[in-house]
Amino acid sequence: MITLKQALSLSQDELETLKNEIDAKVRASDLNAYIKAPSLNGASAKGVPILIKDNISVKGWEITCSSKILEGYVAPYHASVMENLHQNSMAGFGLSNMDEFAMGSTTESSCYGITKNPRDKNRVPGGSSGGSAAAVAGGLAVAALGSDTGGSIRQPASYCGCVGLKPTYGRVSRYGLIAYCSSFDQIGPITQNVEDASILFDAISGYDSKDSTSANLKPTQTFKNLNRDKRFKIAVLMDHIKDASNEVQLAYENTLKALKEMGHEIVEKKMLDSHYQISIYYIISMAEASSNLARFDGVRYGRRAQNIKDLKELYLKSRSEGFGDEVKRRIMLGNFVLSSGYYDAYYLKAQQMRLIIKEQYNKIFEEVDLIFTPVAPTSAHLFNYHASPLEMYLSDIYTIGANLSGLPALSLPVAKDPLGLPIGMQFIAKAFDEQSLLDVSYALEQELDLKLD
């Protein structure tokens, strides 16, 4: 597939030809990365076609978050990132499959069915932005937008062999993003390479008065300033890879060796055990999800239950029929931790621990430029692999720290396991220092020259 950098130099006629080619490929593909052929929606404007995750509002398109409960809901306005794309010669072209309401790590919970990993169709593409990553890796999209709440851009990028960037919280407007966890959610790019990630990130970044959490900063110019010659002080976290598979640990060590040979300084630092971060993340995210999803009741928009006798039954049937099992589980757990008698023991304590984690990251970044970790404990696994939801939650162990602290992080493919499956590694930077993430990744990408096709 042509890269984003290359596509931006095409004429409008050439772009129309490209869109027709993408549409034909999507119709012929069995990955189920798109919800439907992109031509059925049409493009949101003239420009380079960008795949959009199904939780980002595109005016006039049916946006469902891959959930039955939003069946028939047509977005009445553009998300701010869509307006930004249009101003930068890009346009939405197709909606990507995802875990329902972005709650999952495998893209198995979508009402549209599972998405397959293009590297091995018997395996998951990761999630929740699995459709975006599978499409980019499978040659079905030039580039894509995803959302990242606890690793939902970076983990599927790692599983599929793409570059995935989660920007600093507030760097990219969330206006028009259908919320899962408002204090963690962030929109970001999934692309074929670091240059494309930089270009797409620059296009969607910047202050937005419609988002109260938006940082008052101008759009970034990371692509213009990409520098592969910078050298950084990079921290690795002690005992941090003990939960990773042997293949991931080997890729981690080999990448560290490459970074040292490139002239970067590697130092060891210690943080709170990552298993605590899992507990903190899920308590807070489920609590916020239970609040955010309370609006989906069958009254104002989306699916409405039939043959009901009163308002209470309308609420109960619409929500029980419309939500999938994982979403129901998180809503129930979220309501539990917010309930009387449990708020202080769970939610309040989790928020206090979140502050401690942010302070630990800030302390580390007083002495280093970047932190280096795996993205996921394993490469992509087979479908129906997790015996319990808890096992799936643990797959986020390396990614959630950046969301808890609001820091930017990037997933870069660095190796292949013995089965030929991609393995990604992650860089985390201090707040609003996406430039360093992209610089070090750009240099490492060229140094490794990993061929995944």
UniProtKB/Swiss-Prot annotation:
Residues forming coiled coils: none
Catalytic activity entry: L-glutamyl-tRNA(Gln) + L-glutamine + ATP + H2O = L-glutaminyl-tRNA(Gln) + L-glutamate + ADP + phosphate + H(+)
Any Gene Ontology biological process: translation
This enzyme's EC code(s): 6.3.5.7
Nuclease keyword on record: no
Function field: Allows the formation of correctly charged Gln-tRNA(Gln) through the transamidation of misacylated Glu-tRNA(Gln) in organisms which lack glutaminyl-tRNA synthetase. The reaction takes place in the presence of glutamine and ATP through an activated gamma-phospho-Glu-tRNA(Gln).
Taxonomic classification: Bacteria, Pseudomonadati, Campylobacterota, Epsilonproteobacteria, Campylobacterales
GO cellular component, one term: glutamyl-tRNA(Gln) amidotransferase complex
Swiss-Prot/TrEMBL keywords: ATP-binding, Ligase, Nucleotide-binding, Protein biosynthesis
Protein's UniProt name: Glutamyl-tRNA(Gln) amidotransferase subunit A
